[in-house]
Design a protein with these regions (language model features):
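Residue-level recognition of short, well-ordered coil/turn positions
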Residues: 204, 332, 584-585
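Hydrophobic residue at the +6 position relative to the catalytic HRD Asp in the kinase catalytic loop
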Residues: 335-344
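Glycine- and acidic
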Residues: 67-68, 175-182, 298-310, 369-377, ...
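Short, flexible segments with low predicted structural confidence
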Residues: 56-59, 170-171, 298, 363
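Regulatory N- and C-terminal appendages and interdomain linkers associated
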Residues: 2-130, 380-631
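ATP-dependent phospho-/nucleotidyl transfer catalytic cores
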Residues: 189, 219-224, 228-334, 347-473
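Conserved ATP-binding subdomain of kinase catalytic cores across diverse folds
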Residues: 71, 75-79, 83-294, 345-347, ...
């Protein structure tokens, strides 16, 4: 199995760190210790003693989770492990062939129990599934929850201090499975395994994937019978907006407060870590906010009175604004941005019909069920804000309470009649202002990323219209590839485009191999428009850099470090799935993961022709592919 670890890592480390085999990994269960359990199975022992089939679908109230053990597949084969994930979790890569590792990530062993046949103690670290709800395509869907994902334990990397929750997706039924079977199929599991690590390698906030285990004998019914699989994945938190949605829909203000306190104290590094009230909502003013406000301090007065819950909401909003800015800058489309798929921590989460754009098309959606284009590329920033407003509805009482959020009567009895108008007015005002902050943070982050992708050292006010918008309009008009454009731009020397004739000649490198589509106009028009844009870009490059050879080399290096050579596009993932699932190949998964974990490389040293094919032009009839939510 050691061959199935990529030799690439996504980030540099500061020397060696202490690593562990999975059994010795430091483990905790803050989530289950500090939040209320399912009353039907309130302890690990009660759940462990129950027949596995009794732990299936039902309504769960007044709880954040249910204790439930994985339901192992009939047989398993560990086919992929991310070295970057091993490093970040402090797992010794030489131990992945051990039975402990393989049986843990396949759901066959509860690694936290010394005796699986015995009775676990009440304080034992025992697997659980989270309870949440959500708005799906804008409509309330009721109780959802981890219908096939089961968290095993939390672990803190001793070198970084980062805590992660490790979870198995496809590990069997839970009380939140509804009408589903608790399983995941190979095709969706391969897609999630690859894209989780791809986004991380591109520095896009995301949940992660540790391993991929196939279940050759596990037959799962979807549109047809398919083999099953389990992805071991991890994140700083798996809490979603939908976690709060469900409590709000049930009027459970006690659980909302418990969840909010847990996020402020456990998910983030404490109340003092949260961002203070901004001096204004201009882009420049919101980029870096001071932190360190004491937990009980209230900033502002009257309808602008901000307590710690407002600061908590601000942190969640800012993280999601930055996340979606990364999506837009790298043309990643999630495909299903329901509130149960929107992270409190600001992570890309729950990968279904996702895709990276090929040709730039702002109306593209990778989800063939999204007929109204609700979740298309251009709508992602507004949809994330729509979801955050749903979170604000859950937080509204806590935000609106201002300085009275800890008053005994408010905490125990709720909002008194004579306080309602003041509370509502304050909440509406602060949520509206946080919306302004969301837009400002998004734009500031988007401009920062696009400035870097264009090889500029600083952003000018005119860049947005003259460079960013004009480039995107040109790509859309002539059906050109988004990410390839930036990579090709990276290597252009300003001397190569110092005349209009040269610029028109260079413009051809952005065309597809087959040339321009007949529906987009003439090649001469395309060359002229691209040349005009290149002239503006060249001028800005020379403003920020000198025209020396050294400056050119520095700029090329800087641009190649942010403009990927390889992205796991839909056509590549489809081919990968076919070769792994249908043809039984294994090496190709290793190769794709090597490229995925080092996407900015010029080459990876295995097969130059194959690397060129995978990094090159997308086959004409495999552009803008769509898929379903079925997984």
């Amino acid at each position: 199995m050691a061959a199935h670890i990529s030799n690439a890592a996504s980030d540099a480390t500061n020397g060696p760190q202490k690593t562990f085999d999975i059994s010795a990994l430091p483990k905790s269960n803050n989530f289950t210790r500090k939040l209320p359990p399912d009353e039907e199975y309130p302890t690990p022992a009660t759940s462990h003693a129950a027949e596995r089939k009794l732990l299936g679908p039902r309504l769960v109230k007044n709880a954040a989770y249910t204790f439930v053990r994985p339901d192992a597949m009939k047989s398993s084969e560990l086919v992929g492990v991310s070295k970057a994930a091993l490093r970040d979790l402090a797992i010794d890569p030489t131990t992945i062939d051990s039975e402990d590792f393989k049986r843990t990530v396949s759901g066959e062993k509860i690694i936290t129990l010394p005796d699986e046949d015995g009775t676990p103690e009440d304080t034992a670290v025992y697997p659980w599934a989270q309870c949440y709800g959500g708005y799906q395509f804008g409509q309330w869907a009721g109780q959802l929850g981890d219908g096939r994902a089961i968290s095993l334990f939390e672990t803190t990397n001793p070198s970084t201090g980062e805590r992660y929750e490790i979870q198995l997706k496809g590990a069997g039924k839970t009380p939140y499975s509804r009408f589903a079977d608790g399983r995941a199929v190979v095709r969706s599991s391969i897609r999630e395994f690859v894209v989780s690590e791809a986004l991380h390698a591109l520095h896009i906030p995301t949940t992660r994937a540790l391993s991929l285990t196939l279940g050759p004998e596990e037959k799962v019914r979807r549109e047809m019978m398919e083999p099953g699989a389990i992805v071991a994945r991890f994140a700083q938190s798996w809490l979603r907006i939908g976690t709060f949605d469900l409590a709000r829909s049930r009027g459970d203000r006690v659980l909302i407060r418990k969840l909010a306190d847990y996020v402020g104290e456990e998910v983030f590094p404490g109340w003092e870590s949260l961002p203070a009230k901004p001096p204004s909502y201009d882009e420049a003013a919101v980029v870096d906010l001071p932190r360190g406000v004491p937990k009980d301090d209230v900033q502002g007065s009257a309808e602008n009175e901000e307590n710690r819950y407002t600061r908590l909401y601000r942190e969640i909003v800012r993280r999601n604004a930055k996340m979606v800015a990364h999506w837009q800058a790298y043309a990643f489309t999630n495909g299903v941005l329901n509130t149960d798929n929107t992270s409190i921590y600001g992570l890309s989460i729950d990968f279904g019909p996702f895709a990276f754009l090929d040709n730039f098309d702002p109306n593209y959606t990778p989800n063939h069920d999204d007929h109204m284009l609700r979740y298309c590329y251009k709508n992602q920033p507004s949809i994330i804000w729509w979801n955050l407003v749903r979170l604000a509805e859950a937080f509204g009482e806590l935000i609106g309470a201002g300085a009275r959020c800890d008053d005994k009567k408010f905490v125990e009895d709720g909002v008194e009649k004579d306080f309602v108008d003041e509370l509502v007015k304050r909440a509406e005002n602060l949520i509206e202002k946080t919306g302004e902050e969301y837009r400002a943070v998004f734009m500031a982050e988007y401009k920062r990323l696009m400035t870097a992708r264009l090889g500029l050292r600083q952003s000018k006010q005119s860049d947005f219209d003259e460079l960013y918008s004009e480039l995107l309009d040109t790509l859309e008009a002539f059906e050109l590839d988004f990410n390839h454009t930036f990579r090709k731009l990276s290597s252009i020397n300003t001397d190569e485009i110092d005349t209009d004739e040269k610029r028109k000649e260079v413009a051809g490198i952005f065309f597809h191999h087959e040339g321009l589509s007949k529906t987009v106009g003439s090649e001469a028009d395309a060359r002229a428009r691209i040349a005009k844009w290149l002239e503006k870009w060249r001028g800005r490059v020379l403003e920020d850099w000198s025209d020396s050879a050294n400056a050119h080399e520095e700029r090329v290096t800087a641009m190649k470090s942010v403009n990927p050579n390889f992205i796991p596009r839909s056509w590549i993932l489809d081919e990968l799935i076919d070769r792994v699932e249908k043809k039984g190949e294994r090496e190709i998964l290793d190769r794709i993961m090597e490229m995925t974990l080092a996407p900015f490389n010029d080459s990876w040293g295995w097969d130059s022709a194959e690397e060129e094919r995978l990094c090159g032009d997308v086959p004409r009839y495999q552009r803008a592919m769509q898929c379903s939510c079925s997984s």
